[in-house]
Amino acid sequence: MDVLYSLSKTLKDARDKIVEGTLYSNVSDLIQQFNQMVITMNGNEFQTGGIGNLPIRNWNFDFGLLGTTLLNLDANYVETARNTIDYFVDFVDNVCMDEMVRESQRNGIAPQSDSLRKLSGIKFKRINFDNSSEYIENWNLQNRRQRKGFTFHKPNIFPYSASFTLNRSQPAHDNLMGTMWLNAGSEIQVAGFDYSCAINAPANTQQFEHIVQLRRVLTTATITLLPDAERFSFPRVINSADGTTTWYFNPVIFRPNNVEIEFLLNGQIINNYQARFGTIIARNFDTIRLSFQLMRPPPQNMTPAVAALFPNAPPFEHHATVGLTLRIESAICESVLADASETMLANVTSVRQEYAVPVGPVFPPGMNWTDLITNYSPSREDNLQRVFTVASIRSMLIK
């Protein structure tokens, strides 16, 4: 893997810097590095493809070296270099695609394609120039089972989940109380609602709670917490749990009271915040517990317009609603996760779809992330680490 990264890095630098008019002295070190790559690859043969619709291609390396000059690089020099660069880039692209479409239930962190296995040979180690990539570093840690942490800016840790629970219900569905939520990616939105606006609740207050268990532990998380759930702030028709009827939800938004958020690890509270919004920090957690209240305003605090919205008896045409939004902006995870700010999952999925790669023993059809993270396993983690690393290498050359 580190050889593939070095190839890609060298080719990227060469494509960017070996241009007509450049002083040779400014790129002499790069050209020496480029020539070392050519010397190492010359005389070798590789084969890529042969899975799904990815065509089989044979690669033979027999290229001349770039010479020295005391002057600027001229058009002939650059054209010679460009021909070599283009062939090498095409080769790296195909090696990456060949690797991205393969998977294995055992030792999925190791190269799976014949071409990358061959590049892992000792004689190609002379190509190693710069392995400072975060992906390469973490791939090596995972390969040696020495992982200490993998950083993502916005980890897609929540499988998609959109549903509701009713704490009070009737066949007519005209006086409901309960909770509805939408969890996806790195965001939770949850709303508590009461058609009667807590008219008969103790102290005219309804208590709501939403608990989310993560599939992997997160640490050092920067989180945004807002006293609103905008996705549940407009009218909608909702299917009943048994699918036999529908009910009408017409929210009027209140600000939540007595908001408390707990971050737990193995059942123990690690961080606890009360009535605090904006940016918060969670140190170490695998479970999030959100609790909040809907409080009916005292009659003397209601203007006539507000009192008309929430009568003391049915029918209840407007439904008191409170909500919260929790968004993980950044966190460290000891497992490999898709990241909202990166394109690795999209790159891997696109290549697998483009070449009609058959469903293998590890990944779900279409690389469905909700399925993948819901049933996350060590085998999936190993394979994800490998294909994401290859995707990051490919993205250096292929946009």
Swiss-Prot record:
Zn(2+) binds at residue 153. Its main location: virion. GO terms for molecular function: host cell surface receptor binding; metal ion binding; structural molecule activity. InterPro entries: Capsid_hemagglutn (IPR008980), Rotavirus_A/C_VP6 (IPR001385), Virus_capsid_a-hlx_vir (IPR008935). The keyword Cell wall biogenesis/degradation does not apply. Belongs to the rotavirus VP6 family. Intermediate capsid protein that self assembles to form an icosahedral capsid with a T=13 symmetry, which consists of 230 trimers of VP6, with channels at each of its five-fold vertices. This capsid constitutes the middle concentric layer of the viral mature particle. The innermost VP2 capsid and the intermediate VP6 capsid remain intact following cell entry to protect the dsRNA from degradation and to prevent unfavorable antiviral responses in the host cell during all the replication cycle of the virus. The VP6 trimer contains a zinc ion located at the center of the molecule. The zinc ion is not essential for either trimerization or transcription activity of the DLP. Zinc-depleted VP6 has an increased sensitivity to proteases. Homotrimer. Interacts with the inner capsid protein VP2. Interacts with the outer capsid glycoprotein VP7. Interacts with the outer capsid protein VP5*. This is Intermediate capsid protein VP6. It comes from Rotavirus A (isolate RVA/Equine/United Kingdom/H2/1976/G3P4[12]).
